[in-house]
Amino acid sequence: MQKKPMAPQQPTRVRTPREENNEILGIIEQMLGASRVRVRCMDGHTRMGRIPGKLKRKIWVREGDIVIVVPWEVQSDQKCDIIWRYTKGQVSWLSKKGYLKQAYD
């Protein structure tokens, strides 16, 4: 008896960045070590991102991943916290809906 091929899963609900919470989409460019990454944000800035412990324990973040970041109140053009990482299915949904624009090319 053969297994049926699984259909690709469509995301039922995708978390989008909330402007009232100052959230921005970003792409991880480089892993720096010690829970730090370099993130190219959709607002044009390249920031050093910090991966908080609660996120670091649950998921792995790699170069090229699409994430939601929150800039710090101090040094907002240079530093940020990563609060969410998208899966491949969610990234395709975001690109179809126009959230990623030209920065994901």
Curated annotation (Swiss-Prot):
> Any idea which UniProt keywords this protein has?
Initiation factor, Protein biosynthesis
PROSITE patterns on file? IF1A (PS01262), S1_IF1_TYPE (PS50832)
Task: Note the SUPFAM superfamilies from the entry.
Answer: Nucleic acid-binding proteins (SSF50249)
InterPro entries xrefs: NA-bd_OB-fold (IPR012340), RNA-binding_domain_S1_IF1 (IPR006196), TIF_eIF-1A (IPR001253), TIF_eIF-1A_CS (IPR018104)
Start and end of every S1-like domain?
A: 12-87
What one GO molecular function would you report for this record?
A: translation initiation factor activity
Q: Which domain of life is it from?
A: Archaea
| Protein name as annotated | Translation initiation factor 1A
List, alphabetically, the Pfam families matched: eIF-1a (PF01176)
* Keyword Repeat listed: no
